């Protein structure tokens, strides 16, 4: 809880393109089974059927390199990962 969330430039609105090794480093922000979205938040269905939180359509992720709430070590990685703002 309190960990930084990121967006991935290679995703498309409503679609996650981060799987396998990518998802190992950038774990998706998975919604609880009974979650309901509202406002700018929505749910994106991943290939495995899991529901992932999205902001303005863009799927949200954590960065495995962040160890404490407020860490932003993933910001700018590869030029394609950005802190949710």
Model regions and ranges:
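Compact beta-sheet-dominated domain cores in extracellular/mature segments
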Residues: 1-85
């Amino acid at each position: 809880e309190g960990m930084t969330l990121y967006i991935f430039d290679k995703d498309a609105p409503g679609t996650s393109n981060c799987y396998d090794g990518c998802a190992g480093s950038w774990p998706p922000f998975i919604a609880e089974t009974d979650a309901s979205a509202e406002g700018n938040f929505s749910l994106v269905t991943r290939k495995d059927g899991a529901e992932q939180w999205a902001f303005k359509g863009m799927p949200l992720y954590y960065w495995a390199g962040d160890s404490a709430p407020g860490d932003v070590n993933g910001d700018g990685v590869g030029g394609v990962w950005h802190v949710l703002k």
